[in-house]
Amino acid sequence: MGLDSVHQRQALKYRLRAMVREGQLTVDGRNFYGIPSNTGLIKGRIVGHSNGSGVLTPDEGTEDIFLPRKEMEGVFDGDTGLVRILRRDRRNRPEGGLIEVLQHNTETILGRLYFDKSTWMLKSVNPRITQKIIVSQSGLEKEGLIVRAKITRQPSFESMATCRVEELLGHSVSTDIKIAESLRNNEIPELFSKEALSSTAKLENQIMSSDFRGALRAYPFITIDGADAKDFDDAIYCEQDSDHGWRLLVAIADVAHYVPEDSPVDKNAFERGTSVYFPGKVIPMLPISLSNGLCSLKPGEDRLVLVCDIRISKVGTITDYKFYEGMICSTERLTYDQASNGFIAKPWGESLSSAKNLVAKLLVRRKKRGALDFETPEPDLNFDADGRISAVGQKTRNDAMQLIEECMLCANVCAARFIDELKLKGLYRVHERPDEKKMFGLRKFLSSLNVTLPEGLPSPIDLQGALNQLNKKLNGQVLQLAILRSLSQAKYDLRNAGHYGLNISMYTHFTSPIRRYTDFVTHRLIKSVIQS
C-alpha cells in the first residue's frame, strides 16, 4: 500500500479501528478486516470455559459455536457478540471467529490479587473468566487478597482489561459475598421499590368480606411440597366420579387479585421474571408479604385461588375442564415423604388416595403417548454453618413428586387449551422438534454404543426407546445427556408449536404464579375472560 513510515501505518490502524466502531468494517481475532455483511453472522451470548476457550450460544436457539482461546481474548463470559463460522471439526461441530463485541456485560468483578513481574493483576474467582486483568492502582501490597473491582477498560484483541479495586474482602469469599456477586453479575435486583413495599403493606392479612368466595371451603384441599418450601402456590383435591373417572381440582394462588397490571409490584415482578434460589436464601419474585403470606396456601387459612376443575375419564383422558375464581382453606401442608406414605384415616386421606389412583392411570397413558422421561439424578447438597457444601447426596424421586407433576401438567394442558380455543394472545410453552443435523450426530454416537435409532426425524417414542437402552448400560444416566443436548430448548412463544418432549399438541405454564411471571401472565388472561 506504499505505507513507508511508522506514522502512516499507525494512522491507518487508527482509521481502520474507527471504521470498525462505526460499522463500516468488521475485524476478527486475526486482525483481518472486511466489509460487513449480515450473511453468516450469528448473534448470541458468549459463555467462557475454565480452559480459556468458550462458545457462542446463538439467540436463535441453534447449535453452540466453539470459540478457541485466541477468540476469547477480547471478551468476557456473558458478553454479547457476533460470530462467523469458520470451519467444522471432524464431528461436524462449528468453530467460529469473533467478529464484533456488541455489548460488554461485566462491570464489576470479584477476584484475587497477585503480582506479575512489575504489575498488580487480578484473577477472577469466576472460573469462566480466565483473561488477565491489570489493576490500575499501585502500592496495594495485598497479594492473595480477595477484592471487588470495577472494570475500567473492557478486554479487546489489542489490550488487556483493566480494573480499579473498590473493596477489600479478605482471604476467603463467604457465601453471602458470592450470592451478592451473582445477583450483581446477572442484574437481579434484591430489594423491592419503596412504592411496591408501600402498596403491599396496605393489604390486609386476611380475606376481605367483599372478596369472599365460599363454595370450596368445605373441600379438604392439601398442599404437597418439599420439606424446605416456604411459598405454597398450588393445592389439590381429587374424587372419583360415578363413571369411574375422576374430578381433579387444582387450586392455584390468585396472585393477580392482589397485583394489578402495571402496579409497582407488577413492575418489580416483571424485572425479576422468576424467584431465584440460592443455598439458604431466596430472592422472591414477589414481596415476602405476598409470596410467603397472603398468596401462600397455608393450612387453616382462607386463601383466594384460581381453580382448574378437570374431568378425567377412567382411561386417563381429559374430557372436560373449566376455570373459575374460588376460595379455599387448605386442610394440611404435606411434604413429599408424608404424602408418599399416606394417611388414609385423615380427612383428606380419601382425596389423596383418589389422586394416587388417578396418577397411576395418567402415568400409563403418558408412557403410551411416548413422553420423554429422563432419569437424571438430582443432587442433594448439604451446607455447613458457613454456607459451604459439606456433603453431596442424591435426591430420591418418590411417587408423591410424580403425583404433583402430573396434576400440574393436567392443569397446564387445560390452560393451553383455554388459550387456544378462545384464540387468546397467550404464551405457550413450546418445545420444537429437534434439528435434523443434531439427530444425525446423535444417531452416529448411539450407533457406537450399539443403541439403535430409526432413520429420519425420530418421534419421542423412538428417543424414549433409546433412553431405555442407554439406562441399561454402565454410566447410562450420563450417556443419556447426549440425547438431552440434541433436543431443542423449550421456550415461550405466542405461536403454538406443540411440546415435543411431552408429546402433546399444546402446553403452557399456569401453576406457579408466585415464582414465575409467565404463569402470572396466563392467570391474568384467564381471569380477564372469567370476569368479562
Label the predicted regions:
Residues 104-532:
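Conserved, carboxylate-rich catalytic/transport cores that coordinate ions
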Residues 1-133:
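Charged, low-complexity terminal tails
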